[in-house]
């Protein structure tokens, strides 16, 4: 398992510092997480390289591809892969404990249609994701960066919407979910302004939680406390 960070440079050779949507709060791996990475990486892990993936080589078939950015500890992603064996899932997460937990859960569940990466998703999209190949891109509960001075760190922004659009297949879907109303409004504003997308909601801007997105323990607790969750789906239309 390797980790590589790309740097951009000015004409003078100075490094351009990128604004990232995440902070590496790297906790210790448990023995189980570390063991899962050691045991499962060769079959379920994908190292970052500056080369476009061939999904048939990655999964051994040409089934539809669902890609999730920031899967946390991976419980929901593994559950989705279990319930949809004829769909291929790729999860990207920057925190190694989450990657280890996801691999451990996937091994226990016996899923074979799931692969994971431990890298910055933006760099993965720029270098490795084939054009017109992703059926659904999932972004569930990303860091809201709720302080106004940190809004520039939010992953959903005009540049991101532009970058992912050519990776979605014809009528591919970008599915977002957040429990911060301000971030939901921001997502709608960004995506409404982004060319080549249409909101699939039929009543207002948001949709009910789709059956394919599992209800997390965190989300269920939020519901009990009266907290809202906003699901948003935009379809590529150009």
UniProtKB/Swiss-Prot annotation:
Q: In which pathway does it act?
A: tRNA modification; N(7)-methylguanine-tRNA biosynthesis
Q: Which residues form the signal peptide?
A: none
Q: Name one GO cellular component term.
A: tRNA methyltransferase complex
Entry keyword annotation includes Methyltransferase: yes
Q: What is its EC number?
A: 2.1.1.33
User: Which key words tag this protein in UniProt?
Assistant: Methyltransferase, S-adenosyl-L-methionine, Transferase, tRNA processing
Give the reactions, separated by semicolons, that this protein catalyses. guanosine(46) in tRNA + S-adenosyl-L-methionine = N(7)-methylguanosine(46) in tRNA + S-adenosyl-L-homocysteine
Active-site residues, Swiss-Prot/TrEMBL: 143
Q: Per its UniProt record, what Gene3D superfamilies does this chain match? A: Vaccinia Virus protein VP39
Binding annotation for S-adenosyl-L-methionine: 68, 93, 120, 143
Which parts of the sequence bind substrate?
A: 147, 179, 216-219
Q: Which top-level enzyme class is recorded in the Swiss-Prot or TrEMBL entry? A: transferase
Write out the function statement from the record. Answer: Catalyzes the formation of N(7)-methylguanine at position 46 (m7G46) in tRNA.
Family the entry assigns? Belongs to the class I-like SAM-binding methyltransferase superfamily. TrmB family.
Q: Which NCBIfam families match?
A: tRNA (guanosine(46)-N7)-methyltransferase TrmB
Please report the name of this protein according to its UniProt entry: tRNA (guanine-N(7)-)-methyltransferase
Report the source organism: Aliivibrio salmonicida (strain LFI1238)
By which gene is this protein encoded?
trmB
């Amino acid at each position: 398992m390797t980790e590589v960070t790309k740097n951009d440079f000015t004409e003078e050779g100075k490094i351009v510092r990128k604004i990232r949507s995440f902070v590496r709060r790297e906790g210790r791996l448990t023995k189980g997480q570390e063991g899962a990475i050691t045991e499962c990486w060769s079959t379920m892990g994908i190292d970052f390289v500056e080369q476009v993936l061939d999904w048939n080589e990655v999964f051994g078939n040409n089934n539809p591809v669902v890609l999730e950015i920031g899967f946390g500890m991976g419980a929901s992603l593994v559950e989705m892969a279990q319930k949809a064996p004829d769909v291929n899932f790729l999860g990207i997460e920057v925190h190694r404990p989450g990657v280890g937990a996801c691999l451990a859960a996937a091994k226990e569940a016996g899923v074979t249609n799931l692969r994971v990466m431990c890298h910055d998703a933006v760099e993965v999209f720029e270098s490795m994701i084939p054009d017109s190949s992703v059926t659904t891109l999932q972004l569930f509960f990303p860091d809201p960066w709720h302080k106004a001075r940190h809004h520039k760190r939010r992953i959903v922004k005009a540049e991101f919407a532009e970058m992912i659009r050519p990776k979605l297949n014809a009528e591919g879907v970008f599915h977002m979910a957040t429990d911060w109303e301000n971030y939901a409004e921001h997502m709608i504003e960004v995506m409404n302004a982004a060319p080549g997308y249409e909101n699939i909601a039929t009543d207002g801007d948001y949709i009910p939680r789709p059956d394919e997105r599992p209800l997390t323990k965190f989300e269920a607790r939020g519901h009990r406390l009266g907290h809202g969750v906003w699901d948003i789906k935009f379809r590529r239309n150009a």
